[in-house]
Amino acid sequence: MADPKYADLPGIARNEPDVYETSDLPEDDQAEFDAELEELTSTSVEHIIVNPNAAYDKFKDKKVGTRGLDFSDRITKSKRTGYESGEYEILGEGIGIKETPQQKYQRLLHEIQELTQEVEKAQSTVKESAAEEKLTPVALAKQVAALKQQLVSTHLEKLLGPDAAINLTDPDGALAKRLLTQLDVAKTRKNPEGKSPAKGPGPDNENFVTYELHCRPEQNKFSQAAKMAELEKRLGELEAAVRNDQDTQNPLTVGLQGSCLMDTVEILQAKVNLLDVASLDQVEARLQSVLGKMNEIAKHKAAIEDADTESKVHQLYETVQKWDSMSSTLPQVVQRLLMLKQLHEQAMQFGQLLAHLDTTQQMISNSLKDNTNALAMVQKAMKENLATVEDNFTSIDARIKKLSK
């Protein structure tokens, strides 16, 4: 039942249900609806059609590993651990599903590529020295190359073709069977009648089995770099073993310290080329001109040094002459300064006494003012008390007179 206080208000429809209507949505909902509508109708947004059945079939046996994850808010600078994704599929820990040979091959190939990149980076940064560790980057590079070559040699997809997934459990047997099949086909193959044999390197082209040799330039480059690094290491060890203390003053050994054998040979070859008979005359002429210039420079330098020394001696003599005139008056100046020092000390003490006297005088004057004020108050109080006493005596005399009558 409606509240009776609203019964007599105008504009109320009685005996009808209450209806609340509005023309538009609230402002926040309007803005959100406009943004969604603009995004749906915009030509810049790519609309991707997702097949839910295909997505379900792809991810129905997959699980998300939440071990060690932390998506909580942080107040420190350290980052939280979220989901990680890689370039290949790796089974998570604790799933209980055995890794297939194809997945294992992809994982090993990716790890070897990462190891190769790290070794190449270490080779470019680590300096070669005689006191290296046992597992050097060069040795590690050789091991990585051998491991990668072994993995490439077991590349089952290229060797066995599209049927590799069926025979992954026995790759050696599958490879042997495939080779035997190819040999049998090659033996039993004959040229069809009425057709000429295919062109090839020999007359019996169909009676041979053709094998393809695939060359990897990056692998050859990596092996060559590893060999060069190993050679430089051995040369460094050899130089460290046969090297003796070189004379730093010897002009033939200038610039040879710390250089490798090839650089040393090139430097020595350049120095030997300078000793050619055809260039000795030119070198001698240049040396003569340089020697003449050096002699002229030495003469000018000696003259400049003599003039500089003479000017310094003259300045020193003038200073000594001035000092002679000042030395006679110096004791008197010192005595006068000592007397002035004593006078200044006495003046400072007198100033301190005056300051103390001034402070004391101010204190005394303040005390006198306080005492004067107190005396005035006492005198005033005494006058008031005397007046009161006189009044009391007067009243007492009057009473005594009344009583005596």
Curated annotation (Swiss-Prot):
Membrane topology according to the record: Peripheral membrane protein
Region (Disordered): 1-24, 186-207
Coiled-coil annotated spans: 101-134, 383-403
UniProt GO BP: axis elongation; microtubule-based process
Pfam families: Dynamitin
Entry GO CC: centrosome; cytoplasm; dynactin complex; dynein complex; membrane; microtubule; vesicle
This protein's UniProt keywords: Coiled coil, Cytoplasm, Cytoskeleton, Dynein, Membrane, Microtubule
Annotated family: Belongs to the dynactin subunit 2 family.
Localization of this protein: Cytoplasm, Cytoskeleton, Microtubule organizing center, Centrosome; Membrane; Cytoplasm, Cytoskeleton
Name of this protein: Dynactin subunit 2
Subunit text: Subunit of dynactin, a multiprotein complex part of a tripartite complex with dynein and a adapter, such as BICDL1, BICD2 or HOOK3. The dynactin complex is built around ACTR1A/ACTB filament and consists of an actin-related filament composed of a shoulder domain, a pointed end and a barbed end. Its length is defined by its flexible shoulder domain. The soulder is composed of 2 DCTN1 subunits, 4 DCTN2 and 2 DCTN3.
Entry-linked InterPro entries: Dynamitin
Purpose of the protein: Part of the dynactin complex that activates the molecular motor dynein for ultra-processive transport along microtubules. In the dynactin soulder domain, binds the ACTR1A filament and acts as a molecular ruler to determine the length. Modulates cytoplasmic dynein binding to an organelle, and plays a role in prometaphase chromosome alignment and spindle organization during mitosis. Involved in anchoring microtubules to centrosomes.
